[in-house]
C-alpha cells in the first residue's frame, strides 16, 4: 500500500461532489495540501441517469445547488454553470422564468462540476471492504485485491434500487426498476410492446414513467399504474412545510428532539417526499384518463388504486400477472399479459449497511453525531463521517439535494477547520 490518505471518500454523487466543492472554496486549500481520494463504483459520474425522462423537471429550486446556500460567490453555482456556457445560454434559461430546471440540464450541471475534480476520483472502484487496523490506527478500504489506508473516511454511498422479493424472485429481463427506465433495453421493450405495460408504485417516479409511456404507446395498448393506496397522493410543497422539513438549519432542532417525538414528526412529513406525486402531474394524468374515456369509451391507460400484484409468471417473451384488490374482497382477481413490468418501489441503503457491518462486525450499530460523525468509530485520531443516510436523526431533507451544500461546508470545517471569509466585499471607497 502507498502512503496513507488523509481522507478517503466512498461514493461520488451530489453529497461528495458538494463536499469537494466546499474543499475547493476552503481558504486552507485541503485539495492541494492533503491526500484526498474519492472511490466510485461506476465508470463515470452519473446521477439518476435512468430517470432523465424528456420533459421531466427538478422538484427543487436551482438556487439549492451544490454551492449557493453555502457561498453564493462560489465558481460552482448553477448560475455560473450557465454563464460558463455563454451569455446566450444564461439568457435563455432566465427567459423561461422557472426556478426548476429540467432534470437533463441539472444532470449536465452536476457532470460539469464533477469534471473539475476527475484527478481526485478513482472510478470503477466498488469499495466493499472497510475495516480498522489497530496496529497503525488507520482505516483500510478496498475492492477486489486493491487496498488503501486512510486516516479519515466519509461514506456517501447514496441509495440503491430496491426490488421487493416477489419481483426479485422472477428472473426476467422484462422486470425493470425505475432507475433503469431510460436505458436502451427498457426503451426497446416500451417501443415493441403489444400486450401492454404495468407500472408498480405510487410516487413521482411511477407517475413520470406512466406519463412517458402514455405519450409513447398506441392509445389502445394497455397501460396501468397500480398501487395499494386508494388514490395517488399529492406532495405537500407549501412554504411552511418546506421550511420545517427542508431548511438545513432545522437539522439542529430535529436532531435534538426526543427520539419518539422526532420520529412522529418525520412520519407526519412523509407527504413531502415519499410515495407522493406533484399535484400538477396528477391533474395532467387525470385529464388524459378522462380524454381516453371521451374518445374511446374506456380507459386503456389506467390508474389503478387498491391494487396489489399477487403473482408473476415468466412466459419468456411476456409476463402474466395476477392483480387483486386489497379492500374489495368481492372483486375477482384480474389476470394480465404484459411485455414489461416497471418497478418504481424506491431505494434502500444496502451499500452503507454492508460497509457498516464490516466496520462493526459484532452487530454494533453506528452512533451518529449532529455533525455526521460516527461517534463509536474505533480510530483514536481519525474519524468516520456519513452523509445522505441519516434522515431519521437529522430530518427528511438530509437525504436530498437541498441540504448538500450546507452539510458539505460543515464537514469541511470539521475536518480542516474554519475557512477564512472569501466572499467578495464592497470596495473600500463605497459607503
UniProtKB/Swiss-Prot annotation:
Free-text cofactor note: Binds 1 FAD per subunit.
Sites where the protein binds NADP(+): 202-205, 228, 273-275
Residues binding substrate, per UniProt: 64, 242-245, 273, 402
Official protein name in the record: L-ornithine N(5)-monooxygenase
Regions annotated as coiled coil: none
This protein's GO CC annotations: cytoplasm; cytosol; nucleus
Record key words, sorted: Cytoplasm, FAD, Flavoprotein, Monooxygenase, NADP, Nucleus, Oxidoreductase
Residues that bind FAD: 40-48, 59, 399-401
Subcellular location: Cytoplasm; Nucleus
Pathway(s) where this gene product acts: Siderophore biosynthesis; ferrichrome biosynthesis
E.C. designation(s): 1.14.13.196
InterPro entries associated with the record: FAD/NAD-bd_sf (IPR036188), Lys/Orn_oxygenase (IPR025700)
Organism of this sequence: Schizosaccharomyces pombe (strain 972 / ATCC 24843) (Fission yeast)
Gene Ontology BP terms: cellular response to iron ion starvation; ferrichrome biosynthetic process; intracellular iron ion homeostasis
Needed cofactors: FAD
Family stated for the protein in its record: Belongs to the lysine N(6)-hydroxylase/L-ornithine N(5)-oxygenase family.
Reactions accelerated catalytically: L-ornithine + NADPH + O2 = N(5)-hydroxy-L-ornithine + NADP(+) + H2O; L-ornithine + NADH + O2 = N(5)-hydroxy-L-ornithine + NAD(+) + H2O
